[in-house]
């Protein structure tokens, strides 16, 4: 049976740039990097001579908090398509904060594309409570959400 989400994977075009963004701008802790290659990797990704750099970052020490896994395929053409909230796929990854205004300010100061300012939502009547949230893009254009439960 499925127990929980173990990690969330984002394919990136430049692993070093993405590590810097998620670590230095978003404040996630760099946990380490691995290099994948060999027969198992080829089978897993269904690509001959597949090689990948993989980095793990997390903002929480809690076991239930899945890490963000960034993967850059080496010597492979990346099919870059702009993330879109209205396309069938994983539309965004939501990150937690306890100070959404300071995160938003830091993103703006670092010229990160934010799709809006933080917005207030009240879903208390539906059992989900109140929050503030906004969407923004990482260096590859992947849509992320920042949320602060209230």
Positions of PLM-derived features:
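A short, acidic/glycine-rich surface segment
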Residues: 38-43, 76-81, 121-127
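Vicinal oxygen chelate
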Residues: 5-13, 33, 55-75, 79-150
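General N-terminal targeting signals
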Residues: 22, 27, 45-47, 73-74, ...
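Core segments of cupin and vicinal oxygen chelate
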Residues: 11-64, 129
């Amino acid at each position: 049976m499925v127990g929980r989400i173990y990690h969330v994977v984002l394919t990136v075009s430049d692993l070093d740039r993405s590590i810097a963004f998620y670590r230095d701008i978003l404040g996630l802790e760099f946990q380490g990097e691995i290099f994948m290659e060999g027969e198992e990797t080829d089978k897993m990704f269904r690509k001959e001579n597949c090689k990948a750099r993989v980095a793990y970052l997390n903002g929480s020490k809690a076991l239930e908090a899945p890490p963000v896994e960034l993967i850059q395929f080496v010597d492979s053409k990346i099919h870059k398509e702009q993330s879109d909230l209205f396309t069938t796929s994983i539309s965004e990854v939501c990150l937690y904060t306890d100070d959404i205004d300071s995160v938003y300010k830091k993103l703006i100061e670092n010229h990160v594309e934010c799709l809006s300012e933080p917005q207030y939502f009240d879903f208390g009547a539906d059992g989900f409570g109140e929050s503030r949230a906004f969407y923004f893009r990482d260096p590859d254009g992947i849509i992320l959400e920042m949320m602060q439960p209230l």
